[in-house]
Amino acid sequence: MGKLENASWIHDSLMKYLNSTEEYLAYLCGPKRSDLSLPVSVVYALIFVVGVIGNLLVCLVIARHQTLKTPTNYYLFSLAVSDLLVLLLGMPLEVYELWHNYPFLFGPVGCYFKTALFETVCFASILSVTTVSIERYVAIVHPFRAKLESTRRRALRILSLVWSFSVVFSLPNTSIHGIKFQQFPNGSSVPGSATCTVTKPIWVYNFIIQATSFLFYILPMTLISVLYYLMGLRLKRDESLEADKVTVNIHRPSRKSVTKMLFVLVLVFAICWTPFHVDRLFFSFVDEWTESLAAVFNLIHVVSGVFFYLSSAVNPIIYNLLSRRFRAAFRNVVSPSCKWCHPQHRPQGPPAQKVIFLTECHLVELTEDAGPQFPCQSSIHNTQLTTVPCVEEVP
């Protein structure tokens, strides 16, 4: 008897929603507009302006300045391109869905494009950051190897692989998405209910999300942390081997700059990408949803979206504006006729008379204090050094 009364109550509630298509859609899909649509849109607009201007400047200064066309800057150029794709193509779709959760008006092609875009740029960004970290590790710990192997042609080959892998690994998640319509109890489709969502069994989606989060977040984050830890140990060891006052004066600021940059790289990577992957993993591990779990997930989803786009806006600041050379290039692009905006070159002193190791040249190259060129020792003598210009210049 109790079951019959319960079934009757459900039937009465459902019939109430069936009297209005909009009410029935709200019953099935939730509100058509997010409660946070206005404040989130304002935040997104600020991120959009800062991110687009910053990343365009990065691409422009690298393309216009021959001295900035180095292997490391090629990776930063790739990172700026992926950030621009997110901001110019991904963010407008995100803002649209904040104001119109349904229907999805761009059809199956638009759904596939949206999913593939986000997956591809997500993977390409992380792989680019990881590649930069590996390059810097080699430059600091294995400078002779970096001198021989780190070339622009090699960087272009690696970037081709990065984007190819990103596209390939975006296909599984893209293939399980599509347009889904809600249905009335009689089996007919509800008008205006089209959404871009998972159309295959949910366990397939959960497996893909968990696998890609491991491959494209947990592993890179672990690798980057280990590499920066090893670089820190190497820099600390080199600090203890300083033999004279000249070497101390040259490398004390460089060590501080490198340490600060490494810390910022790891910190920003973790802060911006952790909420995004927590959001995906949270959804993939929950089997039975309750009202409280749904509220927590919605909050995480909003926060993860803000940090996801924020990473695209702060990358030009973190990876480029900490470099003195990039700052000078930015000033040159923004105000080429402004003479007082550009720092004057200091006159170079006489050649050093002390012993300076080859590894120290690469430490200088990684700092904001690096000028257009720094002398590298071609051989170790106690007399005047024979010098050659540094080939690879890291911003």
Swiss-Prot record:
The domain of life is Eukaryota
Keywords associated with the record: Cell membrane, Disulfide bond, G-protein coupled receptor, Glycoprotein, Membrane, Receptor, Transducer, Transmembrane, Transmembrane helix
Localization terms from the record: Cell membrane
What's the chief localization of this chain? membrane
**Tissues showing expression:** Expressed primarily in brain tissues, more specifically in medulla and spinal cord. Widespread distribution in peripheral tissues.
SUPFAM superfamilies hit by this protein: Family A G protein-coupled receptor-like
Show the InterPro entries listed in the entry.
Answer: GPCR_Rhodpsn, GPCR_Rhodpsn_7TM, NeuromedU_rcpt, NeuromedU_rcpt_2, NMU-R2_C
| Transmembrane domains' residue ranges | 42-62, 75-95, 116-138, 158-178, 213-233, 258-278, 294-314
User: Which Cys-Cys disulfides exist here?
Assistant: 111-196
Q: What does this protein do?
A: Receptor for the neuromedin-U and neuromedin-S neuropeptides.
Tell me the PANTHER family matching this sequence.
Answer: G-PROTEIN COUPLED RECEPTOR, NEUROMEDIN-U RECEPTOR 2
This protein is called what?
Neuromedin-U receptor 2
Native species = Mus musculus (Mouse)
State the organism's lineage.
Eukaryota, Metazoa, Chordata, Craniata, Vertebrata
